[in-house]
Amino acid sequence: MQLRRLIAWAAAAAALVPAGAFAAGPIKIGFPIPLSGVTAVYGVPVLQGAQLAAKEINAKGGVLGRKLEILPRDSKANADEAVRVSRELIIKNGVDFLVGTLTSAEAPAVSTVAKENHIVFIAPTSKSTILTDPQHINPYIFRVSSNTDVEGLAGATLMARWKNVKTVATIAPDYAYGRDSAAAFVKELKKLRPDIKIVDQEWPKVGQPDFTPFITAQMSKKPDAVYASLFAGDFITFSKEAKPLGYFKAIDNRFIDAAEVGTTDEAKALGAEYPFGIISDSYDPVIFTKNEPPGHKQFIAALKAFTHEKYASGWSIVGYQSIEALVDGIRKAHSTNSDKVAKAMLGMSFDTPVGKRMFSVKSHETFAPE
């Protein structure tokens, strides 16, 4: 039902543009993203952000005289499924570009598809360093988020400030993102606070139905603080199970989660069950600041109107920024040829509702603050 509704929104957005307003066929953007399962809580808002950007751009005449058409597909947060639907989008639907995926299992796999087909692929959220490290980067992959090295450094810097913390544990999903994030954190923490001992590391799978064994195992090691990379439905399930067991109270709420759970999405899902006093980040931290840029206010108002939600998602902005970046690349290249667009995007700066961003020439990332 959710997928049908999102596809309907995309069609409705396209219908708002008068017929005959464009000189040529649409620029097709394939959008593999989780629209079902525990990660849909993020996947759906990311897609909605992209759809909003496309709607606004089309209302202003499109790009190079052509409208944008987003073709969403449910990747199910699974690498094989993300590859399958991406190839189908390229071969069957003839998409010009790929934008999407959510996890660091999907994105590296789709990056390979993009390389094989010489098609630009923008990953809105995948953070694993493997996506853009020197051994794996290719000319067609770009990322509008930061990476796990930055994430781990930030978490370690904050953790190191707690002078009374002597023992630390980690809990992260058992795949590239979680492993990379925890490793980066531990590496930096050892530099900053060599006196701290890592007493436990737990590795639940994505979509873990019951976190109780991991929670009780970690509590038995009596850490003073915890670093986590749990996200989406996993963080929601974990929090609901951990709080009654006294998990957060046992560590005096010294819990840092680097997986963007400091958002309205989790607050809405958990309500009063949201764990008090924890520290986390957000793809759209401007939501919580007093000095909100005018452009961001406009974006939030437009997003609420588009989604008919009372509270704007903290994840939609990365989908929105991905389309903005792609469109600027197309305009700079004055072409939809991926080789030309990819070259145009190297070192390119682009405007977003939270300020300018720029793709690194070396790593194709924006290192966006969160």
Enumerate the language-model features and the residues they cover.
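Periplasmic-binding protein-like
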Residues: L89, N93-L102, V120-P124, A169-A172, ...
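Extracellular/periplasmic Venus flytrap/periplasmic-binding protein
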Residues: E81-R84, S128-I130, N138-L245, F288-P294
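Extracellular/periplasmic periplasmic-binding protein-like sensory domains
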Residues: A242-Y320, R331-K332
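Beta-alpha junction/loop-to-helix N-cap segments that form part of ligand/metal-binding clefts
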Residues: V41-Q48, G62-D133, V144, W203-F211, ...
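Short, low-complexity disordered leader/linker segments with a strong preference
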Residues: M1-K28, A59
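Segments of small-molecule ligand-sensing domains
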Residues: A302-I317, I323-E370
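Extracytoplasmic "Venus flytrap"
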Residues: G30-G49, R73-D80, L102-T103, I171-D180, ...
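Signal peptide-proximal N-terminal region
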Residues: A24, L47-I70, K190-I196
